[in-house]
Structures are given as structure tokens and as C-alpha cells.
UniProtKB/Swiss-Prot annotation:
Name used for this protein in its record: Succinyl-diaminopimelate desuccinylase
Source organism of the structure: Xylella fastidiosa (strain 9a5c)
Family indicated by similarity: Belongs to the peptidase M20A family. DapE subfamily.
Enzyme nomenclature, EC number: 3.5.1.18
Pfam families found in the cross-reference section: M20_dimer, Peptidase_M20
Amino acid sequence: MSEVFDLTCDLISRPSVTPEDAGCQAMIAARLERVGFTCEHLHYGSVANLWATHGQGAPVLVLLGHTDVVPPGPIEAWTSDPFIPQRREGKLYGRGAADMKGSVAAFVIAAERFLVAHAGHPGTLAILLTSDEEGQAIDGVRKVAETLRQRGQGIDWCLTGEPSSSKRLGDLLRVGRRGSLSATLHVKGVQGHVAYPHQARNPIHLAVPALAALTARHWDDGDESFPSTSLQISNIHAGTGANNVIPGALEVAFNLRYNPHWSAPRLESEIVALLDQHGLDYTLHWHRSGEPFYTPEGKLRRIAREVLERFSGAPPEESTGGGTSDARFIAPLGAQCIEIGPVNASIHQVDEHVCLADLEALPDLYQLLIERLLADH
């Protein structure tokens, strides 16, 4: 087929279920070194990270991606083996085809082609890959960003290859993301027989008014760039499984997706104050996944918009929706961040796939972005 097809197939065939890399980064580094990149392997715990750079000085453009994939689930549910790439009816099937080994392959091909034409380009072209995006995201880009900060490494622009397109390649330009804050609430009660409630304290009954207040809370109205903040309860667990036992404890997990009107500490303070109004005996454990970020109108967005319109035939929607991405760790370094990638309709699903026409177009799209940002600088 083509270079990008062959490289994507090679990556898919490596079962890099998070946090495994399965040799993806070593293979990519060998290719990049052949065209003049300096490659540094940063291993933290069981996580592999690759920091590859070409050129020097500003401006610094980072192509950000991940080599890990989510587990495929039951193999028998797939039409073909998720780690044996298969071409069918104009699509390439396999775990990671869309999220995001196709984009990683396109990054590599685009960088190689760019350097053939612009070996002495201004500034720095960097590629940052991790095997910890789909997992805990602790020893991946989060840790690499800390290392880069300590070194004083500046980053001007970051292009993440997450599958951001909705219906067709290039129809959506991600220009920011909401923050994500998770919590696990433990409410203590007193276990007892359901026939003798006066001898027990039912933590479910005690917590219901507080949970109702949490879910009814109107956090904000959002703005022209971000939707309103949302709180969703994701898990509730209590009881022994028997229907005649009042549980002694309740565990509730919830998550907030929040816009820049809030910070994680402010949200935590608000929720603690609300819970304290209900007299619960509780503990609360927080996990901050990342603060919101936003790339304002400027050179990066303008060029990305022009390039996407050229490839998709219409101006892209500019959005801050969706989940989180590793760009949340790069933005605090002062970088303007955007996300452009293939259609996301099949990601994390059985029979994940990428349209072959989109896969073939991705290297050209990324190469044009690199040229507009660095070669035309």
C-alpha cells in the first residue's frame, strides 16, 4: 500500500496494551535517528517514553502521541484478531488503528518527508511518545513534562494526534479541554438487621440527601468556548449482597469535568462544604487528572484551520469538548495546544478501524502543518 499503511500495520501488530510499549518506540526511534533526530528514552517505572528532537532553538513544535492501547476485550468478539492488522472494505482494522497508532505512523512519515525538503529548518521539531496515556497517566507525559520543566525546555506549539474528527477527517479542531477531577466518597454507617433499623445507621439513607444536592448543583453556565461544568456519579457500592442487612459503609465515585471558571482546589472546597452540611461521617479521596486548558485565537489556530479546510473541504468546528488528553500536561509549560486526528467513531470498541483514505491523507496533513509553522517561520 504505502509507507504510512505499512508502518501503522507494524505498530498494530505489536500488542502494546497499556502500559506496555512492545518495542514500538525503539522501532520509531531507529527510523527517526536515521533522518537526524536525537532520541532520548525516558523510562519511569514500567512506562516507556520517547523524546526525539531535530533542530534547535525556538520556535519548538511538539508532535504528541501514545504507543499504548486499551485492552481488546474478548478476542472472539472481533471479526479478526485485534493485533493482526487486516484491510477490509476500505478500512484498516486492529486495536490502535484510530487511537492512535495511525496518527503516530503519520507523524513519523510527515517528519521524514519534512526533513527531506527542510533539513536546515528554523526552530525545533520534536516528537513525544508515551506508553501511559490509556492507563494511569502518571509515569508518562505527566512525568516527562516535569523533566522538561526542570530542564527549562520551552514549547511553543503542541499538536496531539488524538482521533478528534467526528464524521470526516479534519471536520473538528480541538482547541482546548475541560479539566477532570475524580473523587471517592466513603460514608460510614452502622451495620445491622433491616428489622431493627434503630440499632443501625444506614449510610445509604444518610448520604442520599447529600448526593441529591451534589447532582442538583448548578456549577456554571459555561461560555462561548467551554460547556458548563458537569458532575456525574459513576459508581455506588454498599451492602453484603443480602437483602436483610443494613450496610455499614457506602462508597460513591464521581467525576467533574470543569471549565476554566473553576480550579480543582476550589471545586474540592465547594464539595466538602456541601457534604459538611449533611452531618455525614465520611472521608473523601481526590484524584486530579488535569486542569482545563485553552488555545486562544492566533497563528496556530489560524494555520490549523486553513490546513483542515483544505483537506476536509469546509472550515472545521473548533471545540473544547470530549474527554482528557495528554496535552493537559504540556499546556502548563506555556505551549499552545491543538488536537487533530482521524475519525473517532470506533475507538475503544470491538473492530476498531481507520478509513484507509484518511490514513493516507494524515501524513500530508501533518507535513503541511509542520511546514506552515516551521519552514515558513
